[in-house]
């Protein structure tokens, strides 16, 4: 195994104890150098890493552990076998078992071992890392920092009753507030006077009895609106909320005894209480002090602008000799820490507003979908329009009615002529009306209509040129027109007449 100065220099730079956080640019540079020759350079890199892990510098050990993870994830199976070897896992356990090593470093070692064991779980040849994790958990259970996830137990009935009472009280107060706002225009001046008197009385009582005022403030119930994550939590079910250590979660409601519902970065879900710590709301005095500091920073805006203009106009001149620039710089420099805090605070507020906007957009989309689904369901379930019911239209007084025509409507008459049923209550066209009147004038008795002679003549008659004409024989029985058969006048039965088909055809 030959030496590789470039690899050694890159490892020393990536694991420099002066680094307070991991520099992934340096870590990737080491990975690129090792991947050129994974077998030779990999062994050399592991030798240097082992030497730096045995140092007593905690910061160097933390940076080296990050390098180990980077090599395992980016440099292939050669480095994975070297990292999961019995020799290297023994070095990691030696760090955990050393009483002089800080507990934070030991927990970081266990965290890296857990990450590598989870990454190597599909390869049986890399089982030593999994064995090391089990060994550390058995011998040093105090290093397992993450608490157990509690079970989702329903809230007790007393708690539910208490929440119902709180909800009813909130509704009552909101109604009272609404009534007050409705009548405020009528009694605005007397109310202002009463409020001023009450405020003066409260101030006098606080001056005379400051202890009572503090006790009342302490007795006021604290409402937890935000919590901060103490550990990482990965959701295992669909309704759970995943978060990282340090995330700020907005509390929505209590779902179970040990689980609350919250929002984070536009996501909504439940989270265990033993993974978070409440964020106390600042008092009125703290808010006033914070506003005063912000106003002091904003008051220096003109000086900052003047300093920028002076520096821009100075160009290449020696600004150290300019007394005005030195004075402006001296007045602006003290507010730099406060500006950094304000940037973080307003960045968090912006993130919260963006998260709320996303939640509102999702709720609006869901509402529109439900509304559309409900309207479609109502449209499909609506009953069909009821058919028109009423007396059939009767012809005018100028058209005479025959005894048979009174039992059939104009629609049925047209059906008997053409053989095609029309829609109910449809009136015939003028041409059809003329044909109906002609047929009424030459109408025969019912017995003759059903006679064989008329049946044969109707079959042979194909010269009709009316609208929608399809030659069909007449029905041998009277059509049903919505009336009972008893209402048809009785007809005397007649014997069928004997006739000659040839003579009948000649007559036509």
UniProtKB/Swiss-Prot annotation:
Oligomeric and partner information: Component of the ESCRT-0 complex composed of HSE1 and VPS27.
Organism whose genome encodes this protein: Kluyveromyces lactis (strain ATCC 8585 / CBS 2359 / DSM 70799 / NBRC 1267 / NRRL Y-1140 / WM37)
Assigned protein family: Belongs to the STAM family.
Boundaries of every SH3 domain copy: 222-281
Segments forming domain UIM: 162-181
PANTHER family, sorted: JAK PATHWAY SIGNAL TRANSDUCTION ADAPTOR MOLECULE
Transport keyword on record: yes
GO biological process: protein transport to vacuole involved in ubiquitin-dependent protein catabolic process via the multivesicular body sorting pathway
Membrane topology, record value: Peripheral membrane protein
Biased composition (Basic and acidic residues): 143-162
Biased composition (Low complexity): 429-449, 483-497
Localization (cell): Endosome membrane
Keywords: Endosome, Membrane, Protein transport, SH3 domain, Transport
Protein name: Class E vacuolar protein-sorting machinery protein HSE1
VHS domain location: 14-144
